[in-house]
Amino acid sequence: MVKAKIAVNGYGTIGKRVADAVRAQDDMEVIGISKTKPNYEAAVAHQIGYDIYAPAANLEAFEKAGMPAAGTIEEMVEKADLVVDCTPGGIGEKNKPMYEKAGVKAIWQGGEDHSLAGFSFNAICNYEQAVGRDLVRVVSCNTTALCRAIYPIDKELGVKKARVVLARRATDPNDVKKGPINAIVPDPIKLPSHHGPDVKSVLPQINITSAALKIPTTLMHVHTVNMEVEKDCTVDDVKNIFGSQPRIRFVGQGMSSTAEIMEFARDMKRPRNDMWENCIWPESITVGDKELYFFQAVHQESIVVPENVDAIRAMMEFESDGAKSIEKTNKAIGLSKK
């Protein structure tokens, strides 16, 4: 089997997870990852066998640190069929000319604007439209979770309007530079938050509004979701719809917080405690007068990872059926709802 040669530009929270997920597939391989500095993440990448590429000005620093770089980032890009850009928001836009010059396909993350790629991706919603594309943006963690939940409800019941309040984790567990530590921050104060409009970049037919708060935690986001639907339904109808989705998990069995969900991921021996699925509390699902409500938790560090793998497979035209790609990706990384 010919494998797609994938470069991961940016080996941070998302990049290192994407690299490992790509490595787990049988139809793609990681030809290199990029780091700007020879820090602990670069050291681990070197230890587990990734070829590291760095800015030309920093090659000597990597050499002195005992992890010689395989070349420059530009050289890595030249060797790739497709680059997954996992650099911080705003940096990816600056990298676009480099990808265009090399003639490679590129994926960006949700921190970049929709206009950068002209197409925003979610595997369950619009996989088939990504087949053969050269440029794709995988939407953010929150938008990914909302698309996964809204799309099947719209398909089965018709969504007249969605309203979402997001309690967002302040920062990732390894980030000591951000906060808040002892505050709740409306983010933004002016409504709506960007999440509703971002959902519309994938599902333009959905009438949605959103508001968000930053809270002093690092584990997960939590969404309070309300949808007005076209058809009468019951709680069991909604549970059956969500239960049929390959990347939605019900969290019951005494899990009443994000802390317990993360402990559950540890107990399942998930890599890095990752929870790639939407985590919906089934007892929160409430239905009445053609409206439904529920809570869901979102692991911001990992939920977009399988989406990136599916985007690669679509863009490389290895699989035209989104459901088959999702199944293949899930199996390879160990995403099982059992």
Curated annotation (Swiss-Prot):
This is Glyceraldehyde-3-phosphate dehydrogenase 1. The active site is at 141 (nucleophile). The keyword Cell inner membrane does not apply. Coiled coil: none annotated. The keyword Oxidoreductase applies. GO terms for cellular component: cytoplasm. NCBIfam families: GAPDH-II_archae (TIGR01546), PRK04207.1 (NF003251). Its main location: cytoplasm. NAD(+) binds at residues 13-14, 111, 169, 300.
